[in-house]
Amino acid sequence: MRKLTLAFAAASLLFTLNSAVVARASTPQPLWVGTNVAQLAEQAPIHWVSVAQIENSLLGRPPMAVGFDIDDTVLFSSPGFWRGQKTFSPGSEDYLKNPQFWEKMNNGWDEFSMPKEVARQLIAMHVKRGDSIWFVTGRSQTKTETVSKTLQDDFLIPAANMNPVIFAGDKPGQNTKTQWLQAKQIKVFYGDSDNDITAAREAGARGIRVLRAANSSYKPLPMAGALGEEVIVNSEY
């Protein structure tokens, strides 16, 4: 009789525990979690700057050479890269090593790229200062390219300020942009990647981070501000 009582008690306990687990699992998560002012006001403790503050920091300085990365810095170019992957290497990054992709990307596919608003503001500010504008990209070089004209047209850059795009390419273990920033004596360089910031520093330039859009095809997203650099507010678009 004692054994039957113990067995019944154990079965009852097991049923109770299982019921609790099932109840917890089937309980829906709150649809509206809510927030508060403290959470809304919370910002990552990094060096945020605005375009106006950058302009103010350059007051009194003579015209200089300034540089911009292209993809995710001045252009949201994911549509072209997305199409390239689907066309040349579905499911892999091998298309980035395919010269056929770069021929397409550098000769027309930027017609599908969207100019970023932060780039419009920055370039307009530097043109007003009389600065020389350079674009230094990690894209592979091709025999012909229409990127320079696309950028000049998109951002209304006068011929006197515009320079041909520099295709630095990508080499493992080497920051290919550094030598170009040095050669062109670029004093300020804007980019979305860690390599852009380190290239600027290696070249003795001021590296300023532009935020990469969350829906960029280039993942993972970099940790902006992790290198102690200036990061432009609202620069993801």
From Swiss-Prot:
EC number: 3.1.3.2
Name assigned to this protein: Class B acid phosphatase
Family: Belongs to the class B bacterial acid phosphatase family.
GO molecular function, one term: acid phosphatase activity
NCBIfam families xref list: AphA (TIGR01672)
Subunit relationships: Homotetramer.
Keywords: Hydrolase, Magnesium, Metal-binding, Periplasm, Signal
Chain sites annotated for binding substrate: T137, G138, K177
Taxonomic lineage: Bacteria, Pseudomonadati, Pseudomonadota, Gammaproteobacteria, Enterobacterales
Organism domain of life: Bacteria
Details of cofactor binding: Binds 1 Mg(2+) ion per subunit.
Signal peptide: 1-25
Catalytic residues, chain numbering: D69, D71
